[in-house]
Curated annotation (Swiss-Prot):
Free-text remark on how the cofactor is bound: Binds 1 zinc ion per subunit.
Binding, substrate: H14, D16, G170, D279
The protein, known as: Adenosine deaminase
CDD domains, per the entry: ADA (cd01320)
Keyword Hydrolase appears in the UniProt entry: yes
Cofactor list: Zn(2+)
Disulfide bond residue pairs: none
Length: 333
């Protein structure tokens, strides 16, 4: 179901949600961190979703063990490098990795700006080694409040040329986007693109707010847009993309089953929607699974899956020349 003549992208992929279970085990041993299990087989149920979680916040706790072993900036650099290696193994030509440095720094009080620098270094080295093209999206973790997000923003601004976009993720219901207007004003002043997690836990009003007040060019998840016809019209007309994450939305109980996922409806409505993983390490899936298993189960036809693949590049935070070069590179293979 993947068109090998087109670039394969993953533009909604959390770096800190893709820490290998084996790496968690190794870093735990290296830094003498007590883990809930001592073998890979027994650790996996603690760090991967085995059964669907009741809600988004419960799902997010599965990420915690991955960041608890980030006891040094070298560990952060390692997982960034491995994220690029994983992208290469998955056959991705282009990936946008998003990460929350405050979340990654929290367990061991690492310097937030140092985490940003370590991630940049690890990704740069990975791209050089594996030939994958990547850009970084900075996440502000709304769950930790406005001041913590301000600290993350300052760390990103210190490396503004290596950051492509700003995102807001975490507890959408408890910390609405309206709390972060000044943060996004500064992001736009820095010349960054804007993508926002919205319409995952909260309703369509959260998506409207992300677009109108935060300046979102893309929406992460956005499943609740299905409840507002005017919003779907607006998304299609303005070419505001929806970064769909099929398996993730089932695992967080945002959508009851794949057959009920709105991605097919979004594509039929002319919305620029793409297929992405979200937190592949925690979910136990990869982009190939999303295209070949999840998308057909969500009712997408072969042509709709191809359109979603095209949309992934069209939505990417690349300029027209970068997109053209990537298309030509893949077509020439």
């Amino acid at each position: 179901m993947i068109d090998t003549t087109l670039p394969l992208t993953d533009i909604h992929r959390h770096l800190d949600g893709n820490i290998r279970p084996q790496t968690i085990l190794e870093l735990g041993r290296q830094y003498n961190i007590s883990l809930p299990a001592q073998s890979l087989e027994t650790l996996i149920p603690h760090v991967q979703v085995i059964a669907n979680e009741p809600d988004l916040v419960s799902f997010l706790t599965k990420l915690d063990w991955g960041v608890k072993v980030l006891a040094s900036l070298d560990a952060c650099r390692r997982v960034a490098f491995e994220n690029i290696e994983d992208a290469a193994r998955n056959g991705l030509h282009y990936v946008e990795l998003r990460f929350s440095p405050g979340y990654m720094a929290m367990a061991h009080q690492l310097p937030v700006a140092g985490v940003v620098e370590a991630v940049i270094d690890g990704v740069r080295e990975g791209c050089r080694t594996f030939g994958v093209q990547a850009k970084l999206i900075g996440i502000m973790s709304r769950t930790f409040g406005e001041a913590a997000c301000q600290q993350e923003l300052e760390a990103f601004l210190a490396h503004r040329d290596q950051i492509t976009a700003l995102d807001l993720a975490g507890d959408e219901l408890g910390f609405p986007g309206s709390l972060f207007l000044s943060h996004f004003n500064r992001a736009r002043d820095a010349g960054w693109h804007i993508t926002v997690h919205a319409g995952e836990a909260a309703g369509p009003e959260s998506i409207w707010q992300a677009i109108r007040e935060l300046g979102a060019e893309r929406i992460g998840h956005g499943v609740k847009a299905i409840e507002d016809r005017a919003l779907m019209d607006f998304l299609a007309e303005q070419q505001i993309g929806i970064e769909s994450c099929l398996t993730s939305n089932i695992q967080t109980s945002t959508v009851a089953e794949l057959a009920a996922h709105p991605l097919k409806t979004f594509l039929e409505h002319g919305i620029r929607a793409s297929i992405n993983t979200d937190d592949p390490g925690v979910q136990g899936v990869d982009i190939i699974h999303e295209y070949t298993v999840a998308a057909p189960a969500a009712g997408l036809s072969r042509e709709q899956i191809r359109q979603a693949q095209i949309n992934g590049l069209e939505m990417a935070f690349l300029n027209a020349e970068e997109k053209r070069a990537l298309r030509e590179k893949v077509a020439a293979k």
